[in-house]
């Protein structure tokens, strides 16, 4: 077991439906700690930078339109094996394939409007935290 950090986004569909508290309760109930949190309205350029690995995929434009339509909540969660734990709590990207009790099974509307995003590896967590929370990243690395 190792102490890890992950970026988590509570996406616009969940924010619009007042699910922030319910989703945070799941993470905190699993022993994860909130290290940073901010509500943000992101623009197209920022969204495209975050989702750059999906640029050539068919769903890219609809994903960018969705993620920029209204505010979202960005947070850094920390805990033992946080990346795998969070991904397990979130469930499969497609809510119909997600296990019962997971965040996406409970709250997601579709494969795109799936309520949450989380880093999928240590490398992506570092990259995403640096993008979303540059001051926190700088303080962690540079003291």
From Swiss-Prot:
Keywords: ATP-binding, Cytoplasm, Kinase, Magnesium, Metal-binding, Nucleotide metabolism, Nucleotide-binding, Phosphoprotein, Transferase. ATP binds at residues 11, 59, 87, 93, 104, 114. The active site is at 117 (pros-phosphohistidine intermediate). Disulfide bonds: none annotated. It holds the Pfam family NDK. It is found in: Cytoplasm. It catalyses: a 2'-deoxyribonucleoside 5'-diphosphate + ATP = a 2'-deoxyribonucleoside 5'-triphosphate + ADP; a ribonucleoside 5'-diphosphate + ATP = a ribonucleoside 5'-triphosphate + ADP. Its EC number is 2.7.4.6. PROSITE patterns: NDPK (PS00469), NDPK_LIKE (PS51374). GO terms for cellular component: cytoplasm. Major role in the synthesis of nucleoside triphosphates other than ATP. The ATP gamma phosphate is transferred to the NDP beta phosphate via a ping-pong mechanism, using a phosphorylated active-site intermediate. Homotetramer. This is Nucleoside diphosphate kinase. It comes from Clostridium perfringens (strain SM101 / Type A).
